[in-house]
Amino acid sequence: MKHKLITVLFSLLFLGCNTQNTSDSSFDPELRLKELGIVLPETSSPVANYVNTVVSGNLLYVSGKGPLKSDGTYIEGKVGKDLTPEEAYQAARLTGINLIATIKSAIGDLRKVKRIIRVTGMVNAVPEFSEHPKVINGCSDLLVQVFGERGRHTRAAVGMGSLPSNIAVEIDLILELED
């Protein structure tokens, strides 16, 4: 009997320990953006026959975005030829800002983000370039800075022979929304 009671108590203790506590009242991505000096831009319109976002159940799918600058132009070029890895990292960071703007446009309040699940980053690079993960870290690092543990995600970072309009990177993502 004593053994069963101890087992029940430990079970309740572990059930009460949620390692991914998403009901943290201090979680405020918009405050984090402000602290980082980031002002979200207007969301860009799709450039072809698709939509920016789709909600299915509690998942939000965000279409690929690129490094769109405030003047309406993109950071363009191939990494290893036209851009350094650091310049491409900054392009991926800017793309992350554009993704966050798209998320906010779709759901209104960034506190509704329960977790970033998946990031897919495509790098426009010369064939001999092999540091794609370091480039896409520009976006991944930003997501963790803004969303904390909720921003940690699975990821693919791949090289491409070309991207639309010769943009430096294109990144899409999937996230989970609070119920």
Task: Enumerate the predicted regions with their spans.
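Short, polar/acidic, helix-capping and beta-turn segments at strand->helix junctions
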Residues: T19-D179
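Bacterial Sec-dependent N-terminal signal peptides
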Residues: M1-D24
